[in-house]
Amino acid sequence: KILTLPGTPMGDFGLLFGPRIREKGLELRFSFFSTNKGRRMPSIAAGIGGIRGLQLRLNPAARNLVLSYDETNLKKVPFLWVDAQWWEVRFQMTPEGSCSSTNVKLKLWPLKENEPRAWLVNEKFDIEYKGGKCALWGFPYASTPIAFDNLLILSR
């Protein structure tokens, strides 16, 4: 089954899913598909640790990915998204030491290609690891549907 967000009405739409897991590292995997319409492009986001937890947001119009925590931007990475193809995401959050810092890893690649060996992001941040549920958001700025598939949560 594929979870599809229609292109209208325009707005931001999200869902929390999976078990509330604390004190263990989490990996969220999923794939998504969407298209642009003229110069308008959709945006997607995924989170670990609930709505205010660690979030990645793909901003195709700005050609970047943004990692944020509790609405504070942590890192911006240049990224060129191509529409009309499935994309695969691996997003990991692992506590370090006494959970006072967190190691974050991220991969994003076209599904028709092999998974890259290197992580797009592999960095330690001074944010407290709390764990929690996972989240997905869709922002259909292009007025075209956004599809999510192959949702998988792994605990470490």
Predicted regions and their residues:
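Short, aromatic/His-centered strand-loop micro-motif at the edge of beta-sheets
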Residues: 67-90
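Beta-strand-rich interaction surfaces with strong enrichment in secreted/lumenal proteins
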Residues: 14-20, 74-81, 123-126, 137-138
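Secretory/extracellular carbohydrate-interaction modules
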Residues: 2-69, 155
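Flexible glycan-contacting loops in extracellular carbohydrate-active proteins
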Residues: 115-147
